[in-house]
């Protein structure tokens, strides 16, 4: 039961996603605040994974890295270079939504690291539609191939060096790239063909 008396939706994703978020370390002050908000909202929202379930809901995105660098697309409405991502389909897990959205928006086949999905960053932000997005960002591996976005999606999709990507993006995504860089540098995540030194620029 929520504070306003509504019954929470019994969703098996809630406890597992909450556990993943609780285990995720904050990379900076902004992410620390976002983590606090997401933890609280995952416990109290009626339907946190449903975009029609209330003004705040979970979204998922892909921080795509590979031998060509970092993959970004220029958002058609926001006119900013961002990571691919979006809303969850009914019953979909966030890590699966991140892959699906990325493939739909870039035309590239991407996948999680061999050891499984890696939650690399969490960010809470206001969306253009007036909703609040609880964005779960996963480190995703991309192929050595040029993007081929389908008609109807942003045609501005490109690989950038790590330095270029960091300079182009907002502070939240820059934080995600810093976290990804740390995971690669420490060997926590292996990106085939990419050395820690290559993530420096």
Residue ranges of predicted features:
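Acidic, metal-coordinating catalytic segment for phosphate/diphosphate chemistry
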Residues: 22-61
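Short, well-ordered beta-strand micro-motif
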Residues: 64, 139-141, 161
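Conserved Nudix-box catalytic region and its N-terminal flanking loop in Nudix hydrolases
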Residues: 65-104, 163
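Active-site segment of metal-dependent pyrophosphate-handling enzymes
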Residues: 107-146
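NUDIX/MutT-family hydrolases
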Residues: 148-179
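Charged phosphate-binding loop/patch that engages nucleotide di/tri-phosphates or the phosphate backbone
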Residues: 172-201
């Amino acid at each position: 039961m929520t504070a306003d008396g509504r019954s929470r939706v019994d969703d098996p994703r809630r406890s597992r996603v909450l556990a993943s978020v609780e285990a995720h370390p904050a990379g900076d002050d902004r992410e620390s605040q976002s983590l606090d908000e997401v933890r609280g909202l995952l416990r109290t929202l009626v339907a946190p994974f449903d975009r029609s379930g209330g003004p705040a809901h979970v979204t998922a995105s892909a921080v795509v890295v590979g031998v060509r660098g970092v993959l970004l697309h220029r958002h058609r409405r926001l006119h900013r270079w961002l990571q691919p991502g979006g809303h969850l389909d009914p019953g979909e897990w966030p890590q699966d939504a991140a892959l699906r959205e990325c493939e739909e928006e870039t035309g590239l086949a991407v996948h999680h690291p061999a050891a499984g999905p890696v939650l690399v960053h969490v960010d809470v932000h206001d969306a253009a539609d007036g909703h609040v997005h609880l964005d779960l960002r996963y480190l995703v591996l991309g192929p050595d191939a040029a993007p081929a976005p389908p008609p109807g999606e942003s045609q501005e999709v490109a690989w950038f060096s790590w330095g270029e990507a960091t300079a182009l993006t907002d502070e939240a995504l820059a934080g995600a790239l810093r976290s990804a860089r740390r995971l690669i540098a420490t060997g926590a995540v292996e990106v085939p063909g990419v050395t820690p030194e290559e993530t420096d620029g």
